[in-house]
């Protein structure tokens, strides 16, 4: 299966978010470092930049969207799971042109790639509940 430029952008954004969450370094510095050090061939760089910086800037707001639907405290959430959830919630809340089902399915695939063994199930559950609040008409 060919990986699309947008999927690659999402994968890279999750990796950059993970680095940012662990290091708490400047958002722009991590973006520049990531783009300089990673193989960005085949990625939608503009979409990566929007996803990464938009998600990082809105992280506190995105966290508040997911908190009511978490089965554990936010600070007990794994860094990968948090990055994937934040990114998907950014797409759901800020990118109305992305169908909600696409945002959720992409998050599930990211969790399968980067997360713990069954984290995709947890992420799917949180996003399904959160999506109904963010996009009540499921578009």
Curated annotation (Swiss-Prot):
Keywords: RNA-binding, Transcription, Transcription antitermination, Transcription regulation. GO terms for biological process: DNA-templated transcription termination; transcription antitermination. GO terms for molecular function: RNA binding. CDD domains: Terminator_NusB. One of its GO terms (cellular component) is cytosol. InterPro entries: NusB-like_sf (IPR035926), NusB_fam (IPR011605), NusB_RsmB_TIM44 (IPR006027). The keyword Chloroplast does not apply. The keyword NAD does not apply. Belongs to the NusB family. Involved in transcription antitermination. Required for transcription of ribosomal RNA (rRNA) genes. Binds specifically to the boxA antiterminator sequence of the ribosomal RNA (rrn) operons. This is Transcription antitermination protein NusB. It comes from Baumannia cicadellinicola subsp. Homalodisca coagulata.
């Amino acid at each position: 299966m060919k990986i699309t430029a947008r999927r690659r952008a999402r994968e890279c954004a999750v990796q950059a978010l993970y680095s940012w969450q662990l290091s708490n370094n400047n958002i722009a510095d991590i973006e520049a470092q990531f783009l300089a050090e990673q193989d960005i061939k085949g990625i939608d760089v503009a979409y990566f930049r929007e996803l990464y910086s938009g998600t990082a800037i809105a992280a506190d707001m995105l966290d508040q969207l997911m908190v009511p639907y978490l089965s554990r405290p936010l600070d007990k959430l794994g860094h990968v799971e948090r990055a994937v959830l934040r990114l998907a919630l950014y797409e759901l809340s800020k990118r109305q042109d992305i169908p909600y089902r696409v945002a959720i399915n992409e998050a599930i695939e990211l969790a399968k790639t980067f997360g713990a063994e069954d984290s995709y199930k947890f992420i799917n559950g949180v996003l399904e509940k959160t999506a109904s609040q963010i996009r009540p008409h499921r578009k």
